[in-house]
């Protein structure tokens, strides 16, 4: 019927039994169907969704509506373009349980700590994968190299142990302090102790290099870029702490003890206890100077922000005094204050550096 109507509406005047009329405009319009579905062949139109098919024919401006039940929906056939079938089909979404995909919640995906512990594959460098046995073998080799380097440094320091002892005695030697050997072999074991500390200090760069070389393949590209400043800053701060302890902290503490005993007793110190005091003070000060490095690591992971670090400055003051009392082997308040001051300054400097990084 649709084809016949179309032929009648487009036929020339005088054909099909309809004489030409110039004053009355009566024509049979094209059959309109709602909804209109394209069909490659003149087949009966049908709607897939809905119960009825409503058609309307207009003749001379007067509309007649016919209603007939729609036949059962046929199976969908692919049209030449394939767009109609794809538009009618609604893809079924994948079920989401508790707002998570694969057991990972959105909060975990947005957490900087989670991203630090479990980086995505795109951030990982293209390194060679190794089995657990290969890792253990590599760890064994690097430990062997570190022990060999420290052992060689200890032997070298032992060869010049007397010169090292004279250098460490310099802070109090000008004040007339005399060192005694109170037991047989005390000086020998003291030289071994001094050589061990100095050898560990000289071999620490090799140990640090081996640690970095072992953990570097497991780091992402961004973490590798961040590793260089951290290692360099940690090394500089460690040696700066040792230098500060040798030039400022140790002389101040030793002079306090000498002046306090002046006029009452003669200063005759055990060489073993003296070097125990000095070496522990040097290394504890170097370790305490690592506070800014720890702050940068915590800031990069996202655990603590710079504003949070600055908001607890009152507790930091108390903590610096307590840490100075624990780290210094002496019990005098002067040494504790001399160490607590730099610790507080390092903490504030570390918070400022974290703020510069945008954390």
From Swiss-Prot:
GO terms for cellular component: chloroplast thylakoid membrane; TAT protein transport complex. GO terms for biological process: intracellular protein transmembrane transport; protein transport by the Tat complex. NCBIfam families: tatC. It comes from the Eukaryota. The keyword Transit peptide applies. Disruption phenotype: Pale green phenotype. Mutant plants have low levels of chlorophyll, show quick water loss and fail to accumulate ABA under drought. It is a multi-pass membrane protein. GO terms for molecular function: proton motive force dependent protein transmembrane transporter activity. This is Sec-independent protein translocase protein TATC, chloroplastic. Residues 1-23, 59-104 are annotated as: Disordered. The chain crosses the membrane at residues 143-163, 199-219, 226-246, 277-297, 309-329, 334-354. Residues 55-142, 220-225, 298-308, 355-359 are stromal. Pfam families: TatC (PF00902).
């Amino acid at each position: 019927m649709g084809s016949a109507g179309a032929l009648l509406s487009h036929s020339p005047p005088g054909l099909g039994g309809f004489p030409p009329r110039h004053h009355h405009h009566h024509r049979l319009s094209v059959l309109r169907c709602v909804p209109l579905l394209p069909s490659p062949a003149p087949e009966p139109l049908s709607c897939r969704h809905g119960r009825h098919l409503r058609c309307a024919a207009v003749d001379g401006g007067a509309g007649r509506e016919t209603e007939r039940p729609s036949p059962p929906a046929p199976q969908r056939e692919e049209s030449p373009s394939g767009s109609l079938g794809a538009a009618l089909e609604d893809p079924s979404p994948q079920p989401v349980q508790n707002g998570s995909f694969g057991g990972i919640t959105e909060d975990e995906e947005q957490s900087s700590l989670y991203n630090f512990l479990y980086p995505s594959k795109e951030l990982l460098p293209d390194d060679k994968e190794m089995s657990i046995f290969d890792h253990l073998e590599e760890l064994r080799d690097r430990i062997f190299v570190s022990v060999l380097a420290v052992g060689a440094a200890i032997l070298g320091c032992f060869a010049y142990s007397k010169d090292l002892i004279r250098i460490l005695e310099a802070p109090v030697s000008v004040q007339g302090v005399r060192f005694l050997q109170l037991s047989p072999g005390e000086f020998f074991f003291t030289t071994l102790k001094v050589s061990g500390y100095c050898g560990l200090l000289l071999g620490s760069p090799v140990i640090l290099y081996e640690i970095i070389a072992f953990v570097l393949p497991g780091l992402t590209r961004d973490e590798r870029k961040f590793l260089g400043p951290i290692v360099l800053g940690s090394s500089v701060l460690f040696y700066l702490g040792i230098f500060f302890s040798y030039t400022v902290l140790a002389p101040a503490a030793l002079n306090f003890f000498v002046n306090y005993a002046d006029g009452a007793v003669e200063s005759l110190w055990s060489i073993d206890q003296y070097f125990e005091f000095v070496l522990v003070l040097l290394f504890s000060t170097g370790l305490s100077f690592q506070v800014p490095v720890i702050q940068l690591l915590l800031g990069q992971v996202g655990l603590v922000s710079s504003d949070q670090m600055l908001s607890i400055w009152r507790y930091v003051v108390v903590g610096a005094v307590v840490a100075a009392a624990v780290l210094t082997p002496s019990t005098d308040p002067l040494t504790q204050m001399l160490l607590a001051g730099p610790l507080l300054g390092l903490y504030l400097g570390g918070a400022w550096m974290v703020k510069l990084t945008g954390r």
